[in-house]
Curated annotation (Swiss-Prot):
Summary of the function given for this chain in its UniProt record: Catalyzes the phosphorylation of the position 2 hydroxy group of 4-diphosphocytidyl-2C-methyl-D-erythritol.
Active site: K18, D144
Annotated residues for binding of ATP: P102, M103, G104, G105, G106, I107, G108, G109, G110, S111, S112
Swiss-Prot/TrEMBL GO biological process terms: isopentenyl diphosphate biosynthetic process, methylerythritol 4-phosphate pathway; terpenoid biosynthetic process
Organism: Vibrio atlanticus (strain LGP32)
NCBIfam families: ispE (TIGR00154)
InterPro entries in the cross-refs: GHMP_kinase_C_dom, GHMP_kinase_C_sf, GHMP_kinase_N_dom, IspE, Ribosomal_Su5_D2-typ_SF, Ribsml_uS5_D2-typ_fold_subgr
UniProtKB keywords: ATP-binding, Isoprene biosynthesis, Kinase, Nucleotide-binding, Transferase
Main EC class the enzyme belongs to: transferase
UniProt record similarity statement: Belongs to the GHMP kinase family. IspE subfamily.
Pathway assigned to this chain's UniProt record: Isoprenoid biosynthesis; isopentenyl diphosphate biosynthesis via DXP pathway; isopentenyl diphosphate from 1-deoxy-D-xylulose 5-phosphate: step 3/6
The protein's name: 4-diphosphocytidyl-2-C-methyl-D-erythritol kinase
Keyword Kinase recorded: yes
EC number: 2.7.1.148
Length: 296
């Protein structure tokens, strides 16, 4: 490895949100984990990480600190140190996070941050790990991290670990974040949660109306989510993503989505974004690889 070729200037990487366009719970395993079928799609809106590789030290610095999150619990730090440990590299990095995605919204903010760090540092540290290797590291950090690492919209089965690329329509979305925090465990352990939705082929699911099996329980337990979803449904097909708390409405144009956004009170957190089957992270990586090929 020629460390003189290492890029040590700041590099900028997107950390996009994701939506679960549908989520079906098809069973429960003996260990308590739920079998599911879900469709992940990225959007062109998210956090941004400025990553600067450091060949002089192995330290990982992250700024700013996230209130209430210790460094060792920060998925960005966990991802960087996991990559160091897996490869025994002695390099470090300075990482700046521009946070715009709400935490705990079911849109993958933390998992996306972790994946962006893995992809960025794999390139900057010239490690040459494959997507499969990065996804394996990422899976230990969170169930959704591999989807973000691979960077393609995906149909997931099993407990979410079985992925196959998918190409759903790239619609415009209005995503709304109700001001509540949802405990995923409360949803998946609820006695009234649907757990026996029949498994279906992806081709069949893509032709049917999309549903989230968690939505009924979340709306029942969290009136604020029910309120926002009921409001969105006046304008367009709308659903919960993951176990929430974010909800989204789908539109055929940016203008339609923005017109509805304008009617939301300023106190409501929301954004308009376009569905993307190829992650903005993958596009950025390709640009950096083209400009700085790893010819070592």
């Amino acid at each position: 490895m020629d460390t003189e070729k290492m890029i040590t200037t700041p590099t900028h990487w997107p950390s996009p949100a994701k939506l679960n366009l549908f989520l079906y719970i098809t069973g429960r395993r003996d260990n308590g984990y739920h079998e599911l079928q879900t469709l992940f799609q990225f959007v062109d809106f998210g956090d941004e990480l400025t990553v600067t590789a450091n060949r002089e030290t192995s330290s990982i610095t992250i700024t700013p600190e996230i209130p209430g999150v210790a460094t060792e619990d920060n998925l960005i730090w966990k991802a960087a140190t996991a990559l160091q440990q897996h490869t025994s590299t002695t390099f470090g990095a300075d990482i700046q996070l521009k946070k715009v995605l709400p935490m705990g919204g079911g849109i993958g903010g933390g998992s996306s941050n972790a994946a962006t760090v893995l992809v960025a540092l794999n390139h900057l540290w010239q490690l040459n790990l494959s997507d499969d290797q990065l996804a394996e590291i990422g899976l230990k950090l969170g169930a959704d991290v591999p989807v973000f690492v691979r960077g393609h919209a995906a149909f997931a089965e099993g407990v979410g670990e079985q992925l196959q690329p998918a190409n759903p329509d790239e619609k415009w979305y209005l995503v709304v974040k109700p001001q509540v925090s949802i405990a995923t465990v409360d949803i998946f352990t609820h006695s009234e949660l649907t757990r026996n939705t029949p498994k279906r082929a992806l081709s069949t699911l893509l032709e049917q109306e999309y549903v989230n099996d968690c939505e009924k329980i979340v709306r029942m337990l969290y009136p604020e989510v029910d309120k926002q979803l009921s409001w969105l449904l006046q304008y367009a097909p709308s659903r919960l993503t993951g176990t929430g708390s974010c909800v989204f409405a789908e539109f055929s144009s940016k203008k339609e989505a923005e017109l509805v956004l304008e009617q939301l009170p300023d106190t409501v957190s929301a954004f308009v974004a376009k569905g993307r089957n190829i992650s903005p992270l993958k596009e950025t990586l390709a640009e950096y690889q083209s400009a700085h090929p790893q010819s070592i």
